[in-house]
Amino acid sequence: MFTGVATALATPFQENGQLNLEAWAALIEDQIKEGVTGLVIGGTTGEGMTITDDEFETLLVRAVEVANGRAVIIAGTGSNNTAVSIEKTKRAAELGAEMAMVVTPYYNKSTQAGLIAHFTAIADASPIPLMLYNVPSRTGVALAPETVGELAEHPRITALKEASGDISVMAQMMAHIPEGFTVYCGNDDQILPYMAWGAQGVVSVLSNVYPGATVALAEALLAGDLQTARTWQIRLLPVIDELFAEVNPIPVKAALQARGFEVGAPRLPLVPMSATAEAKLLSAMEQFNEVRQ
């Protein structure tokens, strides 16, 4: 488990489309240096749906090596095929992952009973703790608060990344979970309200680009310093808006390139950020950088 910030890492590619492991190591070092306490490999931001199993394993092994115990390694092992998710989770544990982040099965549109059966089967087979991932805008299905409450009774289902974007859902989640179960915010523009409701941190896209500022925001909230937290959240909002002006991870890869990390373009079916949107993103970053100085 972690508190504070876990970065949903972007996956760097070379110009030929192959993994850029040098950039991968540099990105991880930057995250740890800035105080990030968790690293998510192969999630949405990491283009988990378009990297191969071999690439996923290569990224995971290298992340474990570079982090060397300095951050919690979280593997994105979700699938809409329960058996595939089970095997991927077991393999991730063998390679050194300390936790698995498992998204709700997409496209199938499971019932709540199906979601309970799906996650229970994965948890029963998993040697490491699971973080449920609720992101209905991408998957077409939402975890009901009552479902999360039931799943939270499983000893290996220990956390939830709540990315519905609905503050009222967060409130309902907190009303249904048992003591000791951890909720993390999954939306960078809602870190303050989610943590005010009791989330223990954020699984962040923003922290790829501004890890230190994201950590400062989360740490202020953990310390109960709402004034400082509000200041950070407000300053970061223009950048956050532009980081989601096109579908994630298109903008974050453009932002990382601007920061000097050779992450390359996203893989098809995603394409690089439009020139107009990128100009707005870079302008927002420049303005934020000026405010920080």
UniProtKB/Swiss-Prot annotation:
MF annotations from Gene Ontology: 4-hydroxy-tetrahydrodipicolinate synthase activity
Entry's transmembrane regions: none
Keyword NADP: no
GO biological process: diaminopimelate biosynthetic process; lysine biosynthetic process via diaminopimelate
Subcellular location: Cytoplasm
Pathway: Amino-acid biosynthesis; L-lysine biosynthesis via DAP pathway; (S)-tetrahydrodipicolinate from L-aspartate: step 3/4
Positions of the record's site feature: Part of a proton relay during catalysis: T44, Y107
GO cellular component term, pick one: cytosol
Record field: catalytic activity: L-aspartate 4-semialdehyde + pyruvate = (2S,4S)-4-hydroxy-2,3,4,5-tetrahydrodipicolinate + H2O + H(+)
Function as written in the Swiss-Prot or TrEMBL entry: Catalyzes the condensation of (S)-aspartate-beta-semialdehyde [(S)-ASA] and pyruvate to 4-hydroxy-tetrahydrodipicolinate (HTPA).
Subunit (UniProt): Homotetramer; dimer of dimers.
Protein name, as recorded: 4-hydroxy-tetrahydrodipicolinate synthase
